[in-house]
């Protein structure tokens, strides 16, 4: 029997519809949520992501602005640009598209974003608050995964969640959010010996390793929930995840496809966070 598909497009659309309602209510009070996206250089993948983000904003009635800077932009110039956005009343969320050119320090740039506009949830203050379980903007991909689990009716409390990957953007925050919902969490990564001996214990397996079809049937126990965060190209240049879907389908109880699983949720939660930032502004 095939695994149940967790459909990120459908769940994402349901959340977007609710967010669009919130945008209407804000506009009735004279406030249009605004997102500024800063893109440095000519990375084609980044440019595509940014276009998708802008389209998604416009689709729900939000304002979005692209600040496109050349590859050779100095770090000081970028920081000045962010400080100007921090001051602007019409911008409620600021997102700096990563990766940045090598000569720019990402940590310094992210730390410059005003915490009340840090809709990516990457700044040291946002991360610290998340670790403490305080209210803050959550990183969009892990936040999206939590929503997928919630909307699919998957129990987290008391379950063993194993995460493959330890990036600041997905792996580390993912574990924290699961821990806050009373999962027992194990982190694994590229240096973990005998990876299947860990992943085979997972009730919920999160693959966020950035390697095409890396997780096979050897890694998954019968009935596990498998969440595939990866977006890769295989040898035939076909879009695929970190999980070998064909092998794991039928072993997992639930699985996210690539595309159409976690991907749509990342942008959805960015919209969610930006509208939340606008609502916070109005409340204050």
Swiss-Prot record:
UniProt cross-references to SUPFAM superfamilies, sorted A to Z: Aminoacid dehydrogenase-like, N-terminal domain (SSF53223), NAD(P)-binding Rossmann-fold domains (SSF51735)
**Could you cite one Gene Ontology molecular function of this protein?**
methenyltetrahydrofolate cyclohydrolase activity
Q: Does the keyword Hydrolase apply?
A: yes
A GO CC term?
A: cytosol
> EC number(s) in its UniProt entry?
1.5.1.5, 3.5.4.9
- What keywords are annotated for this sequence in UniProt? Amino-acid biosynthesis, Histidine biosynthesis, Hydrolase, Methionine biosynthesis, Multifunctional enzyme, NADP, One-carbon metabolism, Oxidoreductase, Purine biosynthesis
**What highest taxon heads this organism's lineage?**
Bacteria
- Keyword field contains Hydrolase: yes
**Which InterPro entries has this protein been placed in?**
Aminoacid_DH-like_N_sf, NAD(P)-bd_dom_sf, THF_DH/CycHdrlase, THF_DH/CycHdrlase_cat_dom, THF_DH/CycHdrlase_CS, THF_DH/CycHdrlase_NAD-bd_dom
Q: In what pathway does it function?
A: One-carbon metabolism; tetrahydrofolate interconversion
Which residues of this UniProt protein bind NADP(+)? 165-167, 190, 231
Q: Name one GO biological process term.
A: tetrahydrofolate interconversion
Enzymatic reactions: (6R)-5,10-methylene-5,6,7,8-tetrahydrofolate + NADP(+) = (6R)-5,10-methenyltetrahydrofolate + NADPH; (6R)-5,10-methenyltetrahydrofolate + H2O = (6R)-10-formyltetrahydrofolate + H(+)
Q: Its biological function?
A: Catalyzes the oxidation of 5,10-methylenetetrahydrofolate to 5,10-methenyltetrahydrofolate and then the hydrolysis of 5,10-methenyltetrahydrofolate to 10-formyltetrahydrofolate.
- Name the family the entry cites: Belongs to the tetrahydrofolate dehydrogenase/cyclohydrolase family.
According to the record's subunit comment, the protein's assembly and interactions are: Homodimer.
Record-given protein name: Bifunctional protein FolD
The species this protein belongs to is: Lysinibacillus sphaericus (strain C3-41)
């Amino acid at each position: 029997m095939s695994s149940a598909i967790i459909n990120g497009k459908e769940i994402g659309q349901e959340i977007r519809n609710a967010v669009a309602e919130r945008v209407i209510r804000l506009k009735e009070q004279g406030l249009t949520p605004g997102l500024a996206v800063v893109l440095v250089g000519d990375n084609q993948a980044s440019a595509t992501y940014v276009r998708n983000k802008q389209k998604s904003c416009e689709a729900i009635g939000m304002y979005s602005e692209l600040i496109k800077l050349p590859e050779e932009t100095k770090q000081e110039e970028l920081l000045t640009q962010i400080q100007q956005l921090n001051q602007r009343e019409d911008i409620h969320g600021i997102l700096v598209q990563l990766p940045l050119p090598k000569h720019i320090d990402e940590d310094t740039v992210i730390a410059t974003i005003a915490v009340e506009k840090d809709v990516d949830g990457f700044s040291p203050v946002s991360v610290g608050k998340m670790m403490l379980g305080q209210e803050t903007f959550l990183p969009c991909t892990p936040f999206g995964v939590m929503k997928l689990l919630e909307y699919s009716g998957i129990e987290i409390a008391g379950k063993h969640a194993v995460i493959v990957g330890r990036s600041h953007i997905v792996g580390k925050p993912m574990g924290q959010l699961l821990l806050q919902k009373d999962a027992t969490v194990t982190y694994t990564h590229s240096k973990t010996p005998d990876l299947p001996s860990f992943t085979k214990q997972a009730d919920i397996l999160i693959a966020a390793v950035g390697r095409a079809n890396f997780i096979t049937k050897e890694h998954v126990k019968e009935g596990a929930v498998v969440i595939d965060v990866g977006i890769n190209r295989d040898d035939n240049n076909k879009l695929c995840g970190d999980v070998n879907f064909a092998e794991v389908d039928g072993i997992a109880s639930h699985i996210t496809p690539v595309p159409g699983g976690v991907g749509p949720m990342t942008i959805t939660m960015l919209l969610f966070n930006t509208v939340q930032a606008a609502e916070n502004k109005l409340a204050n």
